[in-house]
Regions:
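A short glycine/serine-rich beta->alpha loop
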Residues: 114-123, 207-213, 249
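A non-catalytic alpha/beta surface segment that caps or lines the substrate-entry region
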Residues: 37-84
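Acidic/histidine-rich catalytic neighborhood of metal-dependent amide-processing enzymes
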Residues: 119-194, 234, 240-245, 252-253, ...
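Catalytic-core environment of secreted peptidases
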Residues: 78-123
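N-terminal capping segment at the start of a domain
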Residues: 15-39, 301
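Metal-dependent amide/peptide-bond hydrolase catalytic core
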Residues: 60, 220-346
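Phosphate/diphosphate-binding glycine-rich loops and adjacent basic-rich segments that engage nucleotide
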Residues: 132, 177-213, 217-227
Length: 346
């Protein structure tokens, strides 16, 4: 969930900590200046390790980086607090979509912050990182009573949450999690997100010369094209379906013996999304057989749909925090996946 002031979630009810805007913006400027493309988050992680260590919080880094081919892992810490209150988890990711090297934050007179136009700004998710950092700093600096809280900053979120999938969830104590990874005005929170399923179909035919012996060939691209023509794309009932890439062939005068098709299915009903994936595979198999080809169909569930009950504890705590901060809460639905999909599974 995207929160206006994480200190409202962390603190005892009625306790409001002072947010230092200049410090907050300075931290954002510094974080943005650090290169952090997916799998290359080392600089951001090192800065977070130093900043939290200065607050007396020891972030622990796991070995995820080495496993996924990156240079940084997931960072985690538990901070004790008032045991009469339930602990909460605050989370943000450390990577950004490319181009994420050579970033520079430009502060405009009207209050806007943009990149210089040559890269992304990286507010996704460095704005979330800064919100959490400033909130934690303010709570500890003011000596405010607070609930126990956990921090989890994951690597490689932009590549379908690769980092968080390797985290040891048995370490977590909190049953309430807030993920700072939603765009829009402060006060918005996503309570529902879809399953995201990808598929890959490799059609195999038989190569032959397209002029001298075309009848000896088995046309893999034609088989793939026949399949794609039968797959409805866009909004399909409650789902979205997309064929994203198709590639094959070696030369204009060769009957292609190989063609690869990739795509995805998204939906808020996980079983329905799986059913659609099965239907797509069946279409692929029939089209391949009709052209004398074979097809190898594989799929992967990148994340599973969730829905948070607006009447539940997580949402109610969020509503209370918004009220104390003078914000109008807005519950929204998102069509994107995030770390929260994985937290909801645990």
């Amino acid at each position: 969930m995207m929160l206006g002031n994480p200190s409202e979630i962390m603190g005892n009810e009625g306790v409001v900590c002072m947010i230092r805007e200049e410090r907050l913006l300075g931290a954002f400027r510094e974080l943005v200046s650090i290169d952090n493309p997916t799998l290359r988050e080392r600089g951001v992680c090192d800065l977070l390790l130093r900043r939290y260590a200065a607050l007396g919080i020891r972030l622990q880094e796991d070995g995820t980086g080495a496993v996924i081919g990156g240079n940084a892992g997931n960072l985690y810490a538990f901070v004790p607090g008032d045991e009469a209150l339930a602990p909460v988890l605050l989370s943000a990711h450390t990577d950004a979509v490319s181009p994420a090297c050579g970033k520079r934050a430009v502060f405009h007179p009207d209050g806007r912050i943009t990149s210089d136009g040559t890269t992304v700004l990286g507010a996704d998710d460095l704005a979330g990182q800064c919100a959490i950092l400033e909130a934690v700093t303010s709570v500890l600096e003011d000596g405010a009573p607070h609930r126990p809280f956990e921090l989890l900053f994951d690597a490689a979120e932009e590549s379908y949450c690769t980092g968080i999938q390797r985290f040891d969830f048995s370490r977590l104590r909190a049953k309430l999690a807030y993920v700072f990874d939603l765009s829009g005005p402060v006060g918005g929170a996503a309570y529902q997100a879809p399953s995201i399923l990808s598929f890959r179909a490799v059609f195999t035919g038989r190569a032959a010369h397209a002029a001298f012996s075309p009848e000896e060939g088995r046309h893999a691209i034609r088989a793939a094209a026949q399949a794609v023509a039968q797959i409805p794309c866009g909004r399909v009932g409650e789902l979205t379906v997309n064929v994203g890439t198709i590639a094959g062939g070696t030369a204009d005068n060769i009957v292609p013996d190989r063609c690869t098709v990739t795509g995805e299915v998204r939906g808020f009903d996980h079983p329905l999304a799986l059913q659609k994936l099965g239907e797509i595979e069946a279409v692929m198999q029939r089209a391949a057989a009709a052209e004398g080809c074979t097809v190898e169909f594989t799929s992967e569930v990148f994340c599973q749909a969730y829905r948070v009950d607006p009447a539940g504890e997580a949402a109610q705590l969020f509503f209370g925090a918004c009220a104390r901060a003078g914000l109008e809460p807005r519950m929204t639905v998102t069509y994107g996946g995030s770390d929260n999909n994985h937290y909801c599974l645990h």
